[in-house]
Each structure stands twice: as C-alpha cells, then as structure tokens.
C-alpha cells in the first residue's frame, strides 16, 4: 500500500487526495505520474522521520523522473537526509548532483556551505588554521553563489561573509 494511503492526519489525507486529483488531471505521462507518487511518498516518509523508506522512494522516483528540476528537488531531499545522518561527504556529492540537474537551488548551496563552515570550525578548534581557512573559503564560495541566487534570503550568511571579510560587494546588488 502506498504510504500516501496510510496518512493518519486529516490535513495530510486532504492534501494527498487533492494532489492525486491534480496529478490525474494534468496532461503528463504515466511515468511522470508514477515518479511523483514515489516522490510524494518519500517526502511523507521523510517528514515522519523514516529516512530509510524516504530514500527508497526517492531512488524509485529518480529511476522514473526525467524532468531535471524535479530530479534536482529529489536529490536535494536525499542530501538533506544524508546530512542529518552525519554522512557529510555523501550529502555534498548529492547536493552537487542536485545542482547539476538544476543549478538554481540556493538551498543546496547554503547547506553545502554549512558543512564546509562546520569543518572549518572543527579545524580551527583543533589548531589547524590553514585547513580552517580552506574550509571557510569553500563555504564563502558556495554561500556567495546562494546569496546571488536568493538576494536577501540568507541574511545570516550575508553577515557571516561580511564579518569574515569574505564578501564580494557585487553579491548584494
């Protein structure tokens, strides 16, 4: 039974019914519809904290989905799971795949920067200043791209870029 048929929450059930109706009415092929069902079930599992099931559904969705924007969104969600599980290298690789599919995903860049910045802080705490600077520079690089894609959307990142002297003036205009 698809996960979408097991929702206990009234709002989730209502959303699922509406989404199913919209998908049935849209002029898209059966493969894309099936990919969406897997994606939706993956999202539901992810929201419930069932990451293994979410990843299984996302993998199935990727096998069927041809639209690069939708593939990018699916990959981004997978990367979020890897990141929350502490699989930083896998998360970074998956965020990059998501950006390869759809380069206009500032949240992927933001999250990549979070990993780089965390690694920089760890290196700094361990007294590895050169390594820390390298990680911070990588964070600045991806965060600058994120801010360019979403000006004003990441004020905390803009402040970090300014306070660390890693900002580019053109980012903010």
UniProtKB/Swiss-Prot annotation:
NCBIfam families attached to this UniProt entry: PRK02603.1 (NF002725)
Gene Ontology cellular component list: plasma membrane-derived thylakoid membrane
Membrane topology qualifier: Peripheral membrane protein
One of the GO BP terms on file: photosynthesis
TPR repeat segments: 35-68, 72-105, 120-153
Alphabetical UniProt keywords: Membrane, Photosynthesis, Repeat, Thylakoid, TPR repeat
Matching Pfam families: TPR_19 (PF14559)
Family stated for the protein in its record: Belongs to the Ycf3 family.
SMART domains in UniProt: TPR (SM00028)
Organism: Synechococcus sp. (strain WH7803)
Main location: membrane
Protein's job: Essential for the assembly of the photosystem I (PSI) complex. May act as a chaperone-like factor to guide the assembly of the PSI subunits.
Cellular compartment(s): Cellular thylakoid membrane
Name the UniProt record assigns to this protein: Photosystem I assembly protein Ycf3
InterPro entries recorded: PSI_Ycf3_assembly (IPR022818), TPR-like_helical_dom_sf (IPR011990), TPR_rpt (IPR019734), Ycf3/AcsC/BcsC/TPR_MFPF (IPR051685)
């Amino acid at each position: 039974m698809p996960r979408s048929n097991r929702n206990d929450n009234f709002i989730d059930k209502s959303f699922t019914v509406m989404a199913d109706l919209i998908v049935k009415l849209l002029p898209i092929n059966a493969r894309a519809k099936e990919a969406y069902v897997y994606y939706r079930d993956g999202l539901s599992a992810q929201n419930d904290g069932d990451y293994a099931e979410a990843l299984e559904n996302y993998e199935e969705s990727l096998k069927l989905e041809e639209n690069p924007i939708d593939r990018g969104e699916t990959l981004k969600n997978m990367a979020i799971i890897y990141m929350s599980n502490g699989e930083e290298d896998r998360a970074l690789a998956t965020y990059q795949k998501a950006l390869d599919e759809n380069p206009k995903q500032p949240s992927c860049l933001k999250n990549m920067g979070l990993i780089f910045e965390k690694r920089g802080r760890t290196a700094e705490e361990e007294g590895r200043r050169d390594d820390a600077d390298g990680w911070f520079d990588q964070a600045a690089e991806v965060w600058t791209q994120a801010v360019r894609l979403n000006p004003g959307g990441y004020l905390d990142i803009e402040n970090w870029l300014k306070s660390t002297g890693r900002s580019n003036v053109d980012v903010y205009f």
